[in-house]
Amino acid sequence: MSEPDSSLKKNDSKAAVFARRLASTVVLLSVVFYGLLSGGTLSVVLVGALVMLLNVIGLLEFYGMVKENQLPRFKWLGLTGGVVLLGAVFLYLSGLAAKWFGLAAPSLAGAAELEVAILAVFLIAILVRRVFAHPAPPSFSMNGNTILGVLYVSWLLGFILKIFFFKTTSETPEGAAFDGGFCLLFFILVTKCSDIGAYSLGSLIGRHKMIPK
């Protein structure tokens, strides 16, 4: 193949990658826009479902990387703990727990107490599971890798819910002009624009491949 043909094929490949990234961004942002800005019950459910989906994908990826590095972990226990943690925070902050179980109005302090309680139970569950693990791997590595996945993925994703539901918590001053949906939308737009901008600029003038074949 001649050099011009090779260069043309390379440019087509870059254009195809950029088109796929742009298309996925448009689809994702359309769903996120509706979830964050439409309001109502459907909006709350959509945001919760998206965050939980990210949570499950993130946990699977995290524990997959731990496995690739041949480190011990309780994958399914960690996945269960992460889903329970984020799910409980969603039910509490969305007001569904208060509606179903007659609890007090949601607050950030209450969410923090809930997280601490769930993490404490999760830690006990890991220690109990470790007792029955045969052959027994190092306790610190096994327990630490499992807990780290929940903290790094699920606990941090919980802050998305705290921002989104902040206006419904008891700490929010009456009449405060704060909309968690718009704040999250701003963060997402900045992140995606930075990602696409960096990719486009690197493709046009970059000299060194970040991930060479």
PLM region spans:
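Membrane-embedded alpha-helical bundles of polytopic integral membrane proteins
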Residues: 2-213
